[in-house]
Amino acid sequence: MMYVSARSGSAKRSISSLPHLSQRFKQTENEIVQMFSVPNHEESEKPQEKWKLSRKDPSVRMLDERFIRIVKIFKWGPDAEKALEVLKLKVDHRLVRSILEIDVEINVKIQFFKWAGKRRNFQHDCSTYMTLIRCLEEARLYGEMYRTIQEVVRNTYVSVSPAVLSELVKALGRAKMVSKALSVFYQAKGRKCKPTSSTYNSVILMLMQEGQHEKVHEVYTEMCNEGDCFPDTITYSALISSYEKLGRNDSAIRLFDEMKDNCMQPTEKIYTTLLGIYFKVGKVEKALDLFEEMKRAGCSPTVYTYTELIKGLGKAGRVDEAYGFYKDMLRDGLTPDVVFLNNLMNILGKVGRVEELTNVFSEMGMWRCTPTVVSYNTVIKALFESKAHVSEVSSWFDKMKADSVSPSEFTYSILIDGYCKTNRVEKALLLLEEMDEKGFPPCPAAYCSLINALGKAKRYEAANELFKELKENFGNVSSRVYAVMIKHFGKCGKLSEAVDLFNEMKNQGSGPDVYAYNALMSGMVKAGMINEANSLLRKMEENGCRADINSHNIILNGFARTGVPRRAIEMFETIKHSGIKPDGVTYNTLLGCFAHAGMFEEAARMMREMKDKGFEYDAITYSSILDAVGNVDHEKDDVSSF
């Protein structure tokens, strides 16, 4: 085959990448030079001067193209190495960076980098190492990237600047190699690389991203101890966010004040974080004052700020103010996003303002916000809670699917719970089957709602069947589901089954909670086992499970039903001395006990106490008192007639 110069455009190449032409042909050094020479006669006469030219000089660009052609055709191996040697081109840092930036396989770049490092009178510097590190990160070769970074920090000829160290930390952070990033950081410090605020910020932000908030505080303390390295706005923003996530609200507020004392202007993000903290600790007025301070400081609130604002006001029950801020935000020219609108709908739904909620939903399109599964869940939940007709709820569910929004596990849970509470158990059971068909995992909340509804409908066998199914599919069942099942076993007189479930809970290790104890005590009282129920109450508190008012009311009701007021009065005094406030059920239970026992003076005294405490008489209890008084009057009339 005839070998021709690369300048002959119409001639066939002497080298082919096709498999049947992959055999290497012996070439002279002159032929290789001819193939990749620059079409510039003057420059070819001065090969030693070409690297002194400006980066913008066309000849330099052409020189780079020769290397690119060699690497692309030969890949890497003896041919490529020989071609580079024959061309007698000087390998310098700019050339290495250029070759690493071209579009060739990562393995070619790695091999070229190693080859260049072995050249006489050449050593890699920080710029060539960093170029390779970026290539390795892009190729997701994180192990090779870390080994290269280790070379950088250990190489005595390479000077690692604070800016380079920041980039190394960020690269390892993005690769989720946090411990290795910290190791590199401290190795570089040991080599007298003095980190700046920016370097420390890179470490802090990496730790934050991985949720290592306690470590953030340690790095901040170390930074302050440097003496001449001071926190900046980025540092304060990261620290305040970390403290907020750790629940160290006082520390976050202190840092905010410290920042202002140091004449630093808080950012929108910092103000927004502080707003959330004040609302979380119940300091609503302080949060509103901070919002006004933010505006006075010339820091414009963002949609995230307004989201935090309406969430906090909604939680505090100040819904009108939250809705007012929505209108203010629109007047200020800010466009709400889907997260803001979902939060606003949630606030309106919780207080039953369904019409306004649906209006906000209909406005989403105007703001170019596509309703999400959260949007639909919020509407459906609000409709159930406002006692809307089931057909209206079903129409929203149909609309959701028509809009190609896939229902979530929570959607089904809301619907199943709502249908159960509206006595549409069969519809709820069909939805449970639909969940299974769609591949959703067993949802304990949905099962709990169904088990409870079936129990109320006295379909105890069906409830027990679902309970067993949940245990088989889900493994460990929540205490709340156990409590529901124990309650229904007690109601239908299957106390031994209820006790077995209670003991099963104890064997699981988590231990029964207050709901489970209350359910079993209620079953015992129903079965006339009042003393056993009272013993269980004492055992419950001995086991570290704090009784609530319902626990005491169950026992009080048991004593009241026995017709022995003394024990009921003792329980009432126990409740008051335990620090738990009696409720309306407590007073009405004792009042009924007094009425049945004919203790009218005590009943009258109890009624006055109830009135002082703001409790109303139960209609049934009040009627029984009147009946009892009437019976006494009849008895007196009968006696006087003799």
From Swiss-Prot:
InterPro entries given in the database record: Pentatricopeptide_rpt, TPR-like_helical_dom_sf
Key words, A-Z: Repeat
Domain of life per record: Eukaryota
Example GO BP: mitochondrial respiratory chain complex I assembly
Listed SUPFAM superfamilies: HCP-like
GO cellular component: mitochondrion
PANTHER family: OS03G0856100 PROTEIN, PENTACOTRIPEPTIDE-REPEAT REGION OF PRORP DOMAIN-CONTAINING PROTEIN
Family: Belongs to the PPR family. P subfamily.
Protein name as it appears in the record: Pentatricopeptide repeat-containing protein At3g16010
Native source organism of the sequence: Arabidopsis thaliana
